[in-house]
Amino acid sequence: MSETFLRPKVSSTKVTDWVAPAFDDFEANTAITTITASSLTFSNSSHRRKYLPSTLESNRLSARKRGRLSLEQTHGLETSRERLSDNEPWVDKYKPETQHELAVHKKKIEEVETWLKAQVLEVKPKQGGSVLLITGPPGCGKTTTIKILSKELGIQVQEWVNPILPDFQKDDYKELLSLESNFSVVPYQSQIAVFNDFLLRATKYSKLQMLGDDLTTDKKIILVEELPNQFYRDPNALHEILRKHVQIGRCPLVFIVSDSVSGDNNQRLLFPRNIQEECSVSNISFNPVAPTIMMKFLNRIVTIEASKNGEKIIVPNKTSLELLCQGCSGDIRSAINSLQFSSSKGENSSWSKKKRMSLKSDAAISKSKQKKKHNSTLENQEIQAIGGKDVSLFLFRALGKILYCKRAPLTELDSPRLPAHLSEHDRDTLLVQPEEIVEMSHMPGDFFNLYLHQNYIDFFAEVDDLVPASEFLSFADILGGDWNTRSLLREYSTSVATRGVMHSNKARGFAHCQGGSSFRPLHKPQWFLIQKKYRENCLAAKALFVDFCLPALCLQTQLLPYLALLTIPMRNKAQISFIQDVGRLPLKRSFGRLKMEALTDRELGLIDPDSGDESPHSGGQPAQEAPGEPAQAAQNADPETWSLPLSQNSGSDLPASQPQPFSSKVDMEEEEEEEEDIIIEDYDSEET
């Protein structure tokens, strides 16, 4: 098939230009220019040329009438602009312009402002690039705060936006990979390379001046809110970029990461503690917007909209706004969107429904004389009807709600008190539901019980109250102990543990006596570290005493304690060291006291990777070893080392956590004055 058949040539004719001149307003009498197309090639020229005259005429008429618009057209443009402003989202319409309009606590604003002044305005030359990490829940004003403060301080903001990759079609691949094509590789650049190139260019060159921008200052920051997805798969690439920026960077780098309690802890994955210390990363954590601040912000929006468009919207009352603030969980963006959606006029409007529901509920309350319970039920329904978010709690706050167990005072209208023989179990009504609290924490029930067991003692005032509390925790452990029924009884086990601990604390059983509401720190459970030590001891016992053919549990509980008391010669120093570590208890005051690691308010709970559950911060991958987190260190050793005969093993074959022979000798010398020496003869092959 010839090429001329595929691409027919158009005869040399004059074709009108389909692009209107840019300066057509200044030359009203100038005719439309024409071009001579001698060899113009179209794939479908006749089809395209068919629509040229109408397009030309419309462009020519619009160009001539561009300068003179009638009054009706001017009024129509103004009307269209008003419609656009009415349909504009309230989040964009009422966005803050100054720091006084921010719905953020003043201390957080001062922290960000102080950091910007110190790292941007007062920075020394050749100091290197600094890094700021801003964290907080969604909708708490992180990005808005940094942009407004930068604007007021005269600092430019260069923001990274993830580029949209071009969509390659099937024909594009055919053309690129054809034999006649000059290049056989599809043009592509990785996200990490694009991000690294952006940082280098932003550090080296100034920002381009757009319409309305003021570039009178050379001070600037680089804002990164949307990180490339590749960094979540390979965090080490981001860490290398941070190290390089700290060394050669000229302007500060600001990262914004939203908190998540559903398992995706991006802050811990992308910015671990060692990287923050190495690169001197400053961390500012934002809190959810307080209900009082949010109420003021929503009242201002309602007042402005009622004065401008009072006939087009339904103005909510104070009670509805309070319910809206409770349902948004501190997310002011979600609250404003819900307010705009609910205030729209119509028969199915949510505010009109709530008014009818409130009238019906008032009538029901007056008849049943149970005002409090009905109001609480109605509040939950209204919060969900407004469009409230799913409330989530960090583990720190969830444990606090269980351990402090705040209660509401009972009134005469409530249910009668318990009989006399059950008066010791009389308590006021709880303000929270324990099962809902555990569900909001996104933590499995058995692991939540571990954190509860680690911290519940400090919240009890009487020893007698600890007895039933420990019994409830034991019952909960029995319910979840059998692996065959663990999946079915896990929720019941958590209910027994949480409700049992809350009920056993008599000092906090009533609203008027809260047992001291002072702050008490929370700690991570020591169970993880003990389990790690136990597994390492089992592996070491099996390897060092393989001749006895006993399980690891029998070795450590039955055989080794007796070997420490007998004068049986051992074959090497590793066996001696292990027996001294496991077979006897040292008489030291600090024995058994492990270091407790504090639980921070924004930290996710640790989950044992060996229990079959995936760690919430690993995204399905094996969790990295951390303090207090179990790890199979002994299993990573060389298997050939454990299979060697005991006579060829040495003390270096033990796991890192096991004491070495030299350290054990020092311990024996320290304890000679307190107890009798234990004589363990070394094996001598010459005597036999």
Swiss-Prot record:
Keywords: ATP-binding, Cell cycle, Chromosome, Developmental protein, DNA damage, Nucleotide-binding, Nucleus, Phosphoprotein. Residues 668-688 have a biased composition (Acidic residues). It is found in: Nucleus; Chromosome. GO terms for biological process: DNA damage response; DNA repair; mitotic intra-S DNA damage checkpoint signaling; negative regulation of DNA replication; protein localization to site of double-strand break. Phosphorylated. Phosphorylation on Ser-647 and Ser-657 is cell cycle-regulated, enhanced by genotoxic stress, and required for activation of checkpoint signaling. Phosphorylation is mediated by ATR upon UV or replication arrest, whereas it may be mediated both by ATR and ATM upon ionizing radiation. Phosphorylation on both sites is required for interaction with RAD1 but dispensable for interaction with RFC3 or RFC4. Phosphorylation by ATM in response to DNA damage promotes interaction with NBN and recruitment of the MRN complex to DNA damage sites. Its main location: nucleus. InterPro entries: AAA+_ATPase, Checkpoint_prot_Rad17_Rad24, P-loop_NTPase, Rad17/Rad24_fun/met. The modification Phosphoserine is found at S85, S358, S647, S657. Residues 431-688 are annotated as: Interaction with MCM7. The keyword Transmembrane does not apply. The keyword DNA damage applies. Residues 644-663 have a biased composition (Polar residues). The modification Phosphothreonine is found at T55. A motif (RAD1-binding motif) lies at residues 17-25. Essential for sustained cell growth, maintenance of chromosomal stability, and ATR-dependent checkpoint activation upon DNA damage. Has a weak ATPase activity required for binding to chromatin. Participates in the recruitment of the 9-1-1 (RAD1-RAD9-HUS1) complex and RHNO1 onto chromatin, and in CHEK1 activation. Involved in homologous recombination by mediating recruitment of the MRN complex to DNA damage sites. May also serve as a sensor of DNA replication progression. Belongs to the rad17/RAD24 family. NCBIfam families: rad24. Part of a DNA-binding complex containing RFC2, RFC3, RFC4 and RFC5. Interacts with RAD1 and RAD9 within the 9-1-1 (RAD1-RAD9-HUS1) complex. Interacts with RAD9B, POLE, SNU13 and MCM7. DNA damage promotes interaction with ATR or ATM and disrupts interaction with the 9-1-1 (RAD1-RAD9-HUS1) complex. Interacts (when phosphorylated) with NBN; promoting recruitment of the MRN complex to DNA damage sites. This is Cell cycle checkpoint protein RAD17. The gene is Rad17.
